[in-house]
């Protein structure tokens, strides 16, 4: 079936949705209904630019189709143009990957050169979502969690919140119900729990990241490689509601598995150990082994009641921190011995093993206490009311 031609009215609808936060919250059908009354009141002069844009779009689409030669093949020039676009996309992806690696390496190396690697702070994040659009990478977020981590202290602070987007993507109620029932088991909109104001929520997240990383810095967070696309999409979902932002200061999402690889190499370097056998394939394999899957008492009360411990966003955000502790434990102890012998500034490890055990125990206690307080508040409330759920910050 040939694609439908553009018309001036739909050009107006699309522009109105892009420019208004109210429009971005509407489905296409709702936006068409709303804009219909506005379009009827517009005169020919006001409609002119939109009708002209529609004609230009139709003409551009006809030109893009191009023509076939006598053998039914695409013209050589068109094929080369398409290949050029593919090459450009591949180059941009490669450049983005290299930029991520360079930035991660710079963060770790700067801390190492300033003799403060053990106190360097990193933020790990995780999202749960209700559903994903069928043809685009748009995710509707359901829950967010972040934790601040350092080699010396382990988990330093936790931020978590449930999210009520108000509605899910039109026609995907069944998909959202299936995803929820098989993962986080959170109630769907319009009965969802948590923060309803996306602008407030996004600014609260930025405030937490600024508190962790300092003023005037681009916020950088880490998440497992397979979740990077989903996490970026959820941040865009929250950010697009904020009309006051000019697009600056976006949150950068990096690969936590590459961070683990660089940390392992640099810690071994400080400890004077041979790191020639360390490679990313080995660290990735270790990271994907879940050593805490059957650990009891580390999820919130609601998740425990619903037998959904493994999918709660807070737990997803905390597991990488514990994995790094396990993987780097012996190497960090060796680094401490070398630094103690050389009388350097890194003298914080009196007994690293004891600190790790105490840190993990303290983390479990703090997490359980915070989530228990949250669950008691939620369980005492009626799930059919507005479900206002305050952010939780530990």
Swiss-Prot record:
<keyword id="KW-0469">Meiosis</keyword>
<protein>
    <recommendedName>
        <fullName>Protein maelstrom</fullName>
    </recommendedName>
</protein>
<dbReference type="GO" id="GO:0031047">
    <property type="term" value="P:regulatory ncRNA-mediated gene silencing"/>
</dbReference>
<keyword id="KW-0678">Repressor</keyword>
<dbReference type="GO" id="GO:0005634">
    <property type="term" value="C:nucleus"/>
</dbReference>
<keyword id="KW-0804">Transcription</keyword>
<keyword id="KW-0896">Oogenesis</keyword>
<dbReference type="Pfam" id="PF13017">
    <property type="entry name" value="Maelstrom"/>
</dbReference>
<keyword id="KW-0217">Developmental protein</keyword>
<feature type="DNA-binding region" description="HMG box">
    <location>
        <begin position="2"/>
        <end position="69"/>
    </location>
</feature>
<keyword id="KW-0805">Transcription regulation</keyword>
<dbReference type="GO" id="GO:0060964">
    <property type="term" value="P:regulation of miRNA-mediated gene silencing"/>
</dbReference>
<dbReference type="GO" id="GO:0030718">
    <property type="term" value="P:germ-line stem cell population maintenance"/>
</dbReference>
<dbReference type="GO" id="GO:0045892">
    <property type="term" value="P:negative regulation of DNA-templated transcription"/>
</dbReference>
<dbReference type="GO" id="GO:0007140">
    <property type="term" value="P:male meiotic nuclear division"/>
</dbReference>
<dbReference type="GO" id="GO:0048477">
    <property type="term" value="P:oogenesis"/>
</dbReference>
<dbReference type="GO" id="GO:0043186">
    <property type="term" value="C:P granule"/>
</dbReference>
<keyword id="KW-0238">DNA-binding</keyword>
<feature type="compositionally biased region" description="Basic and acidic residues">
    <location>
        <begin position="73"/>
        <end position="93"/>
    </location>
</feature>
<comment type="function">
    <text>Involved both in the piRNA and miRNA metabolic processes. As a component of the meiotic nuage, plays a central role during oogenesis by repressing transposable elements and preventing their mobilization, which is essential for the germline integrity. Repression of transposable elements is mediated via the piRNA metabolic process, which mediates the repression of transposable elements during meiosis by forming complexes composed of piRNAs and Piwi proteins and governs the repression of transposons.</text>
</comment>
<dbReference type="GO" id="GO:0000976">
    <property type="term" value="F:transcription cis-regulatory region binding"/>
</dbReference>
<dbReference type="GO" id="GO:0048471">
    <property type="term" value="C:perinuclear region of cytoplasm"/>
</dbReference>
<dbReference type="GO" id="GO:0007283">
    <property type="term" value="P:spermatogenesis"/>
</dbReference>
<dbReference type="InterPro" id="IPR039259">
    <property type="entry name" value="Protein_maelstrom"/>
</dbReference>
<keyword id="KW-0963">Cytoplasm</keyword>
<dbReference type="InterPro" id="IPR024970">
    <property type="entry name" value="Maelstrom"/>
</dbReference>
<dbReference type="GO" id="GO:0005737">
    <property type="term" value="C:cytoplasm"/>
</dbReference>
<feature type="region of interest" description="Disordered">
    <location>
        <begin position="44"/>
        <end position="93"/>
    </location>
</feature>
<keyword id="KW-0221">Differentiation</keyword>
<dbReference type="InterPro" id="IPR036910">
    <property type="entry name" value="HMG_box_dom_sf"/>
</dbReference>
<keyword id="KW-0539">Nucleus</keyword>
<comment type="similarity">
    <text>Belongs to the maelstrom family.</text>
</comment>
<dbReference type="GO" id="GO:0034587">
    <property type="term" value="P:piRNA processing"/>
</dbReference>
<keyword id="KW-0943">RNA-mediated gene silencing</keyword>
């Amino acid at each position: 079936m040939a694609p439908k031609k553009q018309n001036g009215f739909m050009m107006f609808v699309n522009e109105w949705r892009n420019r208004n936060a109210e429009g971005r919250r509407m489905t296409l059908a709702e936006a068409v209904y709303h804009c219909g009354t506005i379009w009827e009141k517009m005169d020919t002069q006001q409609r002119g630019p939109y009708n002209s844009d529609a004609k230009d779009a139709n003409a551009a689409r006809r030109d893009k189709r191009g023509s076939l030669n006598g053998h039914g093949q695409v013209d050589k020039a068109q094929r080369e143009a398409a290949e050029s676009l593919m090459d450009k996309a591949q180059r941009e992806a490669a450049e983005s990957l290299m930029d991520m690696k360079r930035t991660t390496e710079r963060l770790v190396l700067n801390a190492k050169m300033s003799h403060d690697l053990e106190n360097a702070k990193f933020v790990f994040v995780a999202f749960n979502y209700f559903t994903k659009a069928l043809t685009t990478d748009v995710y509707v977020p359901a829950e967010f969690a972040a934790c601040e981590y350092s080699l010396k202290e382990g988990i330093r602070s936790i931020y978590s919140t449930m999210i009520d987007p108000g509605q899910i993507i039109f026609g995907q109620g069944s998909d959202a119900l299936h995803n929820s029932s098989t993962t986080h088991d959170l109630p769907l909109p319009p009965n969802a729990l948590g923060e309803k104001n996306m602008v407030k929520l996004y600014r609260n997240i930025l405030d937490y990241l600024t508190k962790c990383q300092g003023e005037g810095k681009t916020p950088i967070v880490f998440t497992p490689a397979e979740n990077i696309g989903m996490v970026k999409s959820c941040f865009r979902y929250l950010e697009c509601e904020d009309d006051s932002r000019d697009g600056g200061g976006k949150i950068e999402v990096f690969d936590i598995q590459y961070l683990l690889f660089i940390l392992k190499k640099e810690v071994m370097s400080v400890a004077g150990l041979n790191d020639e056998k360390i490679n990313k394939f080995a660290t990735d394999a270790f990271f994907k082994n879940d050593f805490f899957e059957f650990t009891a008492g580390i999820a919130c009360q609601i998740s425990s009641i619903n037998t959904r411990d493994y999918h709660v966003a807070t737990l997803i955000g905390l597991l990488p921190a514990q994995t790094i502790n396990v993987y780097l434990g012996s190497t960090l102890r060796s680094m401490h011995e070398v630094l103690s012998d050389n009388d350097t500034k890194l003298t914080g490890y009196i007994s690293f093993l004891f600190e790790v055990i105490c840190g993990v125990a303290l983390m479990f206690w703090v997490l359980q206490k915070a989530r228990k307080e949250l669950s008691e508040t939620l369980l005492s409330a009626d799930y059919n009311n507005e479900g206002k759920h305050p952010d939780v910050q530990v």
